[in-house]
Structures are given as C-alpha cells and as structure tokens.
C-alpha cells in the first residue's frame, strides 16, 4: 500500500491478462481504479513527483499487453463511466462502455451512434483510435473532449484539434488521455435505430469470431484492399502459433484458442505481415497496439 494514495483502489503486481480481451498480459506493478477526477489527479501527481511511469489502459479491447507486463502505474477507468445527455449532446466519461453508451442513445431515440453498437471497448479508447465500422466512425459525431496531459493538467480539445484520420487521432502522438468526450447526435425514429443496430449486430455475429478471446481487427485496411482477403489469399486462414490462431471465420481476426501468450500473438502477426507481403507486395499495418515488456 502506498500511504500517499490511501483510499484509492490500487492493486500491486496484478496480472493484466484478467483485464484484456485477448486474455494475455503480464503483471502491472500498480493497477489503479480511480473513482473520480480527484483520485486520478492524485495518482498522476504522485507518479510524476516520484518519476514513476504511468499509463491508462482503457478497456484493452484492441490491445496486446506483452507477457512481461507493464512497469509503474496502469490506470483503468472502469469506475469513471458516467453517461449524460444535454439535449442532443451526449457526454460520456472515458471508462463508459462503448456498446452500453450506444444503448443510451437508442433509448432516447438519438441517431448517429448506431455504427458502434457492437464495437467492444471504452469511450476513451474509441476516441483515441477513432473507432469505426460499417461506414461510421467517432470523428463523424465527435464534438470535444476533456483530456489529461502527461504533466497532469486537464484541458479541452476540439474536433478540429483532434485531427482525426483513419484509426488515428492527435492524442496518439501527444500522449494526452481522454477523461470524457461529447458527441453530437440527432433526433431519430426509435424503431429505425433499433432495426439498424440489430442488423449490424447480426452481421458481426455472422462474420466475426465473437466466441473467442481476441483483440478485434488486427490490421488496418490497406488502400485498395481488404486485410482479411489478403490473408486468405496467402493461405493463412487457420494458421496457428502456439495458442493463437488466424480465425477461420474472419481472417482479419486472431483468436486465443488454447491459453496463448502475447508472444504467440506477436509472432503470428509478424508471420502474417511477412507472408502477405511476399504473396501480394502489400505490407499490412497493425491496428492493434502492442505495449509492455517481453519476458
């Protein structure tokens, strides 16, 4: 227990595989769950003052944590998950579940968030990655965000300043951490919104291996191609390294089928990149983030 942070939920040497969608990942020195912005500021101030590294993990849905884990503080926003409506503006804290947030919009007959109805992860991670699917993306509805700078200061970032691109935002370079975000929605027909969300969720169940642990879509879509098709054309569907396999259902996914490790994921990703480039001349770029230390 760290005396200066008494009262905050902090767990020492906690295995991160219990918190990641891939079910892989070594220990964090300190895993912290702040309940509010004050506790978050206390953690960051303490870490910065004592020169201890810190990072925010989010919901760890499009992420691989290496088997050696992460040094310093890993902060999770599970308890910072409030969702509020002000007219047609929806504001959500960074730890709010993305799928559950789309249900709030649906309940109030607000349209614009349907594309995200089946995307796993948190609001903070969705903004960070400019998450998207089926023609929609966060950039289309984003208004502004409150962020925590690496120095521990809170500031506001506009949609223009966020400089969204394909699976990209400026905070991937600046190191700013989303605390909350506002989205501009529109009044819609409740039945139409429900039908569209049901349609998209049906497509996901048909095409994606949702029954297995995975990190979601592994590669960005290369211009003029589909990553999954390139992987299939290279005869890699079902290819396995250790306990991790290229999904037979959707080659753009890698699934943990037999107690796989982060190293299995990394080795399989590297093999797929090499083989696809040799077969097609196209070099795939990972969409998934890989962090932490190797064993």
From Swiss-Prot:
GO terms for cellular component: cytosol. Its main location: cytoplasm. InterPro entries: FAD-bd_PCMH (IPR016166), FAD-bd_PCMH-like_sf (IPR036318), FAD-bd_PCMH_sub1 (IPR016167), FAD-bd_PCMH_sub2 (IPR016169), MurB (IPR003170), MurB_C (IPR011601), MurB_C_sf (IPR036635), Oxid_FAD_bind_N (IPR006094). It catalyses: UDP-N-acetyl-alpha-D-muramate + NADP(+) = UDP-N-acetyl-3-O-(1-carboxyvinyl)-alpha-D-glucosamine + NADPH + H(+). One of its GO terms (biological process) is regulation of cell shape. The active site is at 167, 217 (proton donor), 287. Its cofactor is FAD. GO terms for molecular function: FAD binding; UDP-N-acetylmuramate dehydrogenase activity. Residues 23-188 form the FAD-binding PCMH-type domain. Its EC number is 1.3.1.98. Pathway: Cell wall biogenesis; peptidoglycan biosynthesis. Pfam families: FAD_binding_4 (PF01565), MurB_C (PF02873). Belongs to the MurB family. Cell wall formation. This is UDP-N-acetylenolpyruvoylglucosamine reductase. The gene is murB.
